[in-house]
Amino acid sequence: MLLILQQQHTNAQFLQADNDILGDTFKNFFNLNPLDGIFKSGCWDSILTSGTSGIKKTGHLIVGTDCDDKIRGDSADEVIYTLKGNDQVWAGSGNDIIYGGMGSNRLYGERNNDIIIPGDGSNLVDGGSGNDVLYGGVGNNLLVGGRDNDQLIAGTGTTIMDGGIGSNEFDCSGNTIVINYNPDYGDTIAGNCKIVNNMGINITRDIDIS
């Protein structure tokens, strides 16, 4: 069944879907390979917390490398840049800003209020708890708000957005799909997007992004 949801400044297609349909729709949507420490491209994965050389931390600024980095923040308010490579970032419990570089990245804000901006490639952007601002990029992006009140802003590529628990704002552009939209909880939409009515689906569990 296809309905048209009318809102101010919004044209939204409202779709009925279940877990099987979502799995078929988004299967292989992302090409985010697991980062397993395998030697490639002339360097090893770098892990900040293990003291591996390459990643630089100066005060509250962390800059990655051209390798497939694994970067872990702490309780400070940090600014984290990844460069080339398929990177994973866990920002920690501060109010952090993450800038994703080239490659397919997994960027986790974790706790408190974060801003996450991915670069090129297919990216998973997860705000965690706190009032977060999540951006889509040029490629295929999955934005997950998590807990609290989040703002999810689509990029120019194909973007799937799940606000999670809280009152969320979805800013749609390009080819955007919104999951678990619930205006009764204060969710709002600006722009043009498709809404999949699948309340109760855990997007990080039920959609294959491998």
Model-flagged regions — what are they?
Residues 158-207:
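Leucine-rich solenoid repeat scaffolds
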Residues 20-24, 28-93, 204-209:
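N-terminal segments that cap or nucleate solenoid repeat domains
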Residues 1-12:
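Sec-dependent, cleavable N-terminal signal peptides
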Residues 13-21:
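Cleaved targeting-peptide boundary
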Residues 6, 36-37, 56, 155, ...:
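Processing junctions and N-termini across compartments
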